[in-house]
């Protein structure tokens, strides 16, 4: 920001400065290009502060009303596109104050009584993030509903289950989708926990030591909807834990989105062909006319790196800062703003993908689970039920699979006589036990993929989401 001799933003500084900032340094120092994002929150915080000053007798009630009117005038100007801060303002706080003084004259200069930009920006940032946390929770709930709707449509559809990206055991497709609903619920729980630590007011901590002005911090905290105030003024102006916590929680949201995105990319390939992408959620190639590319999940997967990078950047920025406020904190905003925007955009895109962007190919999925050895564990379980020790059964089934691979056949292709070459306990009922739907149905342990257990979870989640319980 310019110094005392340049005019304009000089109103923000004391007469200690005789020379203005070098133009390059002025641009380097300014944050108005991005912290203008906090304008509405800055106005809200300033109105609460002005009212409190009036109620505490620091300024007259008439002056407080004038300040509030001026701040609302700025809000109206911003909505009409008439409030145009420039580099001379340095940041959103000086931009508002400069315009307020232009509107009200000397009364406008009283707004900053009893506060500093240090507690002011912390207040603005918390108000802004609190609102975005609520927005993100709504988007995550929508995503859960999209997943649940898909799951409800595939109660009896089977899909290969994988470990190490190798066919493992067949699953109910609804069970697979329900796993992501559980992940997203953990994300929502984490973000709710973060919100509690966002919702603490630093306003009134001033620069670092509090103020001699007889203000009422509880008053402004209540007016702005904060649950409580920071107990220590140094901590109040230097705390950015909440920004790190949000970015860490958002990183986990992105991890979960990326895992599903990766699966959709696989599923949409010709090698899998488990899903068909709609024209509304896919793009083509500029060269190859046959292509339909899964751009949505690919972008979600790619954007994870941005959010992870912001988390690392915030941690690195904060780790060496002595108390209390340091200009380094200016770097928190772009990282936080981009994390919020990127995460919300990715959740919204994946919701649309689930709602109208893909169709599961039930026939292809059925064929997939009938063409592998993912029922091998059930042979072992069958033998265990016949009294064979599990490890012995495990070794025996491995030998059977080896023989089938050598002969190019599946377990279901073996005759009873061939099975009994391996163990005399095997009877005709084995073939029924190997049927894919039977393999899934018998997984009856709580949380398992058995159809009855899946129905329980579908009912649970439908009731929970319909009732709005977060």
From Swiss-Prot:
The lineage of its organism: Bacteria, Bacillati, Cyanobacteriota, Cyanophyceae, Synechococcales. It catalyses: 2-(N(omega)-L-arginino)succinate = fumarate + L-arginine. Signal peptide: none annotated. Belongs to the lyase 1 family. Argininosuccinate lyase subfamily. CDD domains: Argininosuccinate_lyase. Its EC number is 4.3.2.1. It comes from the Bacteria. Keywords: Amino-acid biosynthesis, Arginine biosynthesis, Cytoplasm, Lyase. It is an enzyme of class 4 (lyase). Pathway: Amino-acid biosynthesis; L-arginine biosynthesis; L-arginine from L-ornithine and carbamoyl phosphate: step 3/3. This is Argininosuccinate lyase. One of its GO terms (molecular function) is argininosuccinate lyase activity. Gene3D superfamilies: Fumarase/aspartase (C-terminal domain), Fumarase/aspartase (Central domain), Fumarase/aspartase (N-terminal domain). Pfam families: ASL_C2 (PF14698), Lyase_1 (PF00206). It comes from Prochlorococcus marinus (strain MIT 9303). It is found in: Cytoplasm. One of its GO terms (cellular component) is cytosol. One of its GO terms (biological process) is arginine biosynthetic process via ornithine.
């Amino acid at each position: 920001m310019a110094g005392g001799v340049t005019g304009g933003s000089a109103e923000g500084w004391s007469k200690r400065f005789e020379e203005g900032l070098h133009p390059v340094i002025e641009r380097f120092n300014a944050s108005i290009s991005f912290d203008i994002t906090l304008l509405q929150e800055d106005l809200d915080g300033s109105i609460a502060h002005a009212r409190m000053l009036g109620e505490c007798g620091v300024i007259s009630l008439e002056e407080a009303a004038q300040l509030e009117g001026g701040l609302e005038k700025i809000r109206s100007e911003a909505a009409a596109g008439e409030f145009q801060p420039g580099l001379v303002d340095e940041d959103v706080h000086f931009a508002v104050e400069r315009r307020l003084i232009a509107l009200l004259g000397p009364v406008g200069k009283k707004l900053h009584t009893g506060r500093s930009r240090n507690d002011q920006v912390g207040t603005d940032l918390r108000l802004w993030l609190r609102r975005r946390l609520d927005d993100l929770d709504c988007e995550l709930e929508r995503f859960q509903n999209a997943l649940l709707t898909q799951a409800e449509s595939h109660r009896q559809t089977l899909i290969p289950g994988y470990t190490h990206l190798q066919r493992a055991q067949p699953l109910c497709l609804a069970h697979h989708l329900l796993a992501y609903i559980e992940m997203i619920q953990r994300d929502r729980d984490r973000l709710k926990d973060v919100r509690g630590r966002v919702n603490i007011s630093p306003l009134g901590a001033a620069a670092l030591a509090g103020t001699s002005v007889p203000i009422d911090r509880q008053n402004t905290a209540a007016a702005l909807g904060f649950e409580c105030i920071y107990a220590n003024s140094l901590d109040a102006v230097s705390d950015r834990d909440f920004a790190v916590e949000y970015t860490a929680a958002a990183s986990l949201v992105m991890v979960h989105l990326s895992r599903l995105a990766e699966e959709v990319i696989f599923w949409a390939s010709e090698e899998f062909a488990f899903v068909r992408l709609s024209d509304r959620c896919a793009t083509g190639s500029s060269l190859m006319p046959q292509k339909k590319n899964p751009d949505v999940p690919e972008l979600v997967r790619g954007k994870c790196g941005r959010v992870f990078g912001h988390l690392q950047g915030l941690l690195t920025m904060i780790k060496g800062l002595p108390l209390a406020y340091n200009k380094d904190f200016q770097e928190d905003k772009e990282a936080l703003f981009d994390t919020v925007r990127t995460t919300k955009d990715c959740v919204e895109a994946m919701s649309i993908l689930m709602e109208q962007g893909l169709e599961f190919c039930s026939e292809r999925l059925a064929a997939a689970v009938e063409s592998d050895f993912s029922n091998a564990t059930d042979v072992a379980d069958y033998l265990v039920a016949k009294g064979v020790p599990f490890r012995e059964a495990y070794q025996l089934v491995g030998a059977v699979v080896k023989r089938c691979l050598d002969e190019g056949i599946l377990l279901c292709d073996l005759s009873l006589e061939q099975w009994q070459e391996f163990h005399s306990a095997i009877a005709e009922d084995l073939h029924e036990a190997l049927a894919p739907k039977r393999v899934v149905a018998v997984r009856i342990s709580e949380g398992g993929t058995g159809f009855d257990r899946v129905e329980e979870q579908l009912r649970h989640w439908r009731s929970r989401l319909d009732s709005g319980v977060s």
